[in-house]
């Protein structure tokens, strides 16, 4: 009887582990450095650089997790993170100097240009920067 119970427990345990297996990441990898041009509704036109790094240990199936860093000369560094679902992604970013409340969330769509480079178009919203703000960025992987 003890053998039968042990066998049933072993089978049940293996089925439980198999049911929770995380699928491997199969989505596109957007890792790299992107040159960007932007239009901020308060600050006007700007240029910047975005660095994305895939966090494979936190990615699965078509869902990608990334470290995100936007660097804008004259303004500073905006570290954050990005979550992607196929070619769509959302980003959160915040200026390292938190006194200006310059932080926000963006949504973007990735595609490849005629040269085969990844690019994305982003809309962002900053709820507390200068009473609220939004803007756009277009970025191309270098």
Language-model features, listed with the residues they occupy:
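Central antiparallel beta-sheet cores of small beta-barrel/beta-sandwich binding domains
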Residues: 20-142
């Amino acid at each position: 009887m003890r053998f039968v119970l042990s066998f049933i427990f072993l089978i049940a345990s293996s089925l439980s582990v198999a049911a929770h297996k995380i699928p491997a990441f199969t989505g596109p990898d957007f890792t790299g450095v992107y040159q960007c041009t932007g239009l901020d509704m308060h600050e006007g036109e700007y240029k910047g650089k975005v660095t994305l790094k895939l966090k494979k240990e936190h990615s699965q199936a078509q869902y990608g997790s990334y470290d995100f860093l936007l660097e804008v000369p004259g303004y500073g560094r905006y570290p954050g993170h990005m979550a992607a679902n196929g070619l769509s992604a959302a980003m959160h970013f915040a200026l390292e100097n938190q006194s200006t409340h310059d932080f926000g969330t963006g949504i973007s769509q990735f595609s490849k240009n005629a040269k085969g480079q990844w690019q994305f178009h982003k809309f962002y919203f900053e709820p507390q920067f200068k009473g609220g703000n939004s803007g756009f960025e277009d970025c191309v992987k270098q």
